[in-house]
């Protein structure tokens, strides 16, 4: 089976394990690609240390039973924020932090049997926000 990535010469070690599986989700009689959680963490701690942030996102992915493929994190200087992403076989988790505002924006998009809600306690423990705003989107709704 040819896909767009293989046409570009990009291959994943996980490709053979997941090829042919349907990772769409069915919930409440609706079928869709996956659940995308958008989190705004206000009054958050630990928003400067890229190693701690990467560990937190890895722990969050593991709590959701996701498969981590790659990670990349960038630190914007000693007192600057961090932007980073975990690429998952089931989609991604990304973060952008603004330490000057004690703020972190986190996206968790997962398909298949992973449960992105299981990531939330891990993130709450690490970042200890005063306020959390959470919204859920069902991506790829089948008409």
Please provide the spans of the model-predicted regions.
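Polybasic/polar functional segments that serve as interface/processing modules
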Residues: 1-143
